[in-house]
Regions:
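P-loop NTP-binding core
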Residues: 1-276
């Protein structure tokens, strides 16, 4: 059994020991993942993190997508960075050295940059390459209550690193046609990582996003998702909102950009559900 061209080379005992690192942490480490692009993954990561920070949780967002949308969406220019998560993955620096504060109290981010795209190739021959992020986050686990990892849409070494580092997976699903396309593959890949690298991993949360109450389609998709995933689906849905779409261009989460809009209220409620 293999992932990304046979990237599972560690012995089963070593893999299990390394995979158990995340279970001993104080922070909850949540990978926000969906193998489809354009499903509100980064929007959910940013705004869920900001809403959790408002609830006095110490939150770290790890931008593991080379597009760096979570970075810029939190008001940080990826072009002006001296180092980013790319250098962390190559073990050239630490999370502590690259972490950036945001406008939101209690919310920090490990920024990304376009250079991260090269990490997929550079890590191919690296020892214990699936555990680079896991080991890096272990050093700051006591500094945060929640660590959210914004995964790239493709299943490569970056996403595998996120799944190995995480204890749970949150999947945003847009309430639109083809919403479930590729979802079975994602669940299957999570199971592969669980069996081979991280026995504690589970899909814990499904968030319904881009919900349009004016259409029957949104409700039909929501019903289908709830039938498939049961109580893992959050009760709170995230509405389709122009304000949610505008906020990233201003480098702010919706809780700052428009604190009283429907999107901000919805993400605060979603945060309460996820926090439990």
């Amino acid at each position: 059994m293999s992932l990304t061209g046979g990237s599972l080379h560690l012995s089963s005992v070593t893999s299990m020991m390394l995979g158990m690192l995340s279970q001993n942490r104080r922070a909850r480490v949540i990978a926000v993942a969906n193998q489809k692009g354009g499903v509100g993954k980064t929007t959910t990561t940013i705004n869920l993190g900001a809403a959790m920070a408002e609830s006095d949780k110490r939150v770290l967002i790890v931008d593991l997508d080379p597009q760096a949308n979570a970075t810029t969406g939190l008001g940080i220019s990826s072009r002006g960075l001296q180092s980013s998560v790319y250098e962390v993955m190559l073990q050239q620096t630490t999370v502590t050295e690259v972490v950036c504060a945001t406008e939101v109290p209690n919310l920090e981010v490990v920024p990304s940059s376009l250079a991260l795209a090269g990490a997929e190739i550079e890590l191919v021959t690296a020892f214990s390459r699936e555990h680079r992020l896991d080991r890096a986050l272990e050093t700051v686990a006591d500094d945060y209550d929640i660590i959210l990892i914004d995964c790239p849409p493709a299943l490569g070494l970056l996403t595998i690193n996120a799944l190995v580092a995480a204890g749970e997976v949150l999947v945003p699903i847009q309430c639109e046609y083809y919403a479930l396309e590729g979802l079975g593959q994602l669940v299957g890949n999570v199971e592969l990582v669980k069996e081979n690298l991280n026995p504690g991993l589970e899909v814990s949360t499904i968030a319904l996003v881009m919900y349009d109450a004016r259409t029957n389609l949104s409700e039909q998709v929501a019903e289908e998702v709830r039938t498939f995933f049961g109580d893992k689906v959050c009760r709170q849905v995230i509405p389709r909102s122009v304000r949610l779409s505008e906020a990233p261009s201003f480098g702010q989460p919706i809780t700052l950009f428009d604190p009283t809009c429907r999107g901000a209220i919805a993400y605060r409620q979603l945060a309460k559900e996820v926090l439990g």
